[in-house]
Design a protein with these regions (language model features):
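A short SAM/SAH-binding and catalytic strip from SAM-dependent methyltransferases
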Residues: 93-107
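Conserved class I S-adenosyl-L-methionine
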Residues: 1-30
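A short acidic, Gly/Pro-enriched loop at the edge of an enzyme's catalytic core
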Residues: 84-94
């Protein structure tokens, strides 16, 4: 879904709060090895690298991995989340899938989780809900673009993001996650650039033969003020977290 927009993805995708990974690391039984599955351009990997002795980060997209930051203790591998032969049995202390699990074949992924998880390992599926702008007028334009203009072009599994993964199959006893959100100060073009990473925008271009982003840009320009004005933009975080046997 993301290979053809890998550079834009790494440029515009928002970063997670470091305290989220501090929280997850404190839950892990040890800090020897973390697995970031469906790592994309390494948005979560960079945080895990400072907290664990080793990190293995996997993604099926080589284009995405090519944009990921390099660390001495991180190994990147082109592999699907459902099959990570680079990982040994019962070796991983923390398994993270950040904004990725809704793409997985979950029964096969959970089988792989059970194979690689160390005793008492933690599994955390992280998602951020759809973008919100604090300015209500600008937010109304963005929500109209999301819910009307490109809504028909989202993959079916997108609804899992909108429910904060509560609709996702998760056959484990759960632990609550921290109450956090991603928050940035963005100008108009950053909001438009971020929207350009949406898989629905890519599918709109493919099926309609034109780019929908000018629709969003025109709408935001009419209400934004100076284009380089910064507006608070945020994504509420949601989780499914468990401790494995």
């Amino acid at each position: 879904h993301f290979s053809s927009t890998a550079i834009d993805y790494s440029k515009f995708r928002p970063d997670y709060p470091p305290t989220l990974f501090d929280d997850l690391a404190t839950r892990a039984p040890q800090r020897r090895l973390a697995w970031d599955c469906g790592c994309g351009g390494g948005q979560a990997t960079r945080h895990l690298a400072r907290l664990f002795d080793r990190v293995v980060a996997t993604d099926p997209s080589a284009a995405q991995l090519a944009t990921a930051p390099q660390f001495l203790n991180v190994t990147y591998d082109t592999a699907p989340a459902e099959h990570a032969p680079i990982l040994q049995d019962h070796s991983v202390d923390l398994i993270v899938a950040a904004q990725a699990a809704h793409w997985f074949d979950l029964p096969r992924f959970y089988d792989e989780v059970r194979r690689v998880a160390a005793p008492n390992a933690v599994l955390a599926l992280i998602t951020y809900r759809p973008t919100q702008i604090v300015d209500p007028v600008a937010n109304a334009v963005l929500q109209d673009f999301y819910t009307r203009t490109v809504s028909p072009y989202w993959p079916a599994d997108r609804h899992h993001v909108e429910t904060g993964y509560q609709s996702l199959d998760f056959p484990f006893p759960e632990e609550p996650g921290p109450d956090m959100k991603i928050e940035v100060q963005w100008d108009l073009e950053q909001v438009v650039g971020y929207a350009g990473t949406w898989s629905a925008v890519k599918e709109y271009r493919h099926r309609c033969g034109e780019d929908p982003l000018p629709i969003l840009r025109r709408g935001l320009t009419s209400v934004w003020g100076a284009p380089d004005d910064k507006k608070t933009t945020f994504w509420p975080l949601s989780y499914r977290i468990t401790r494995l046997p």
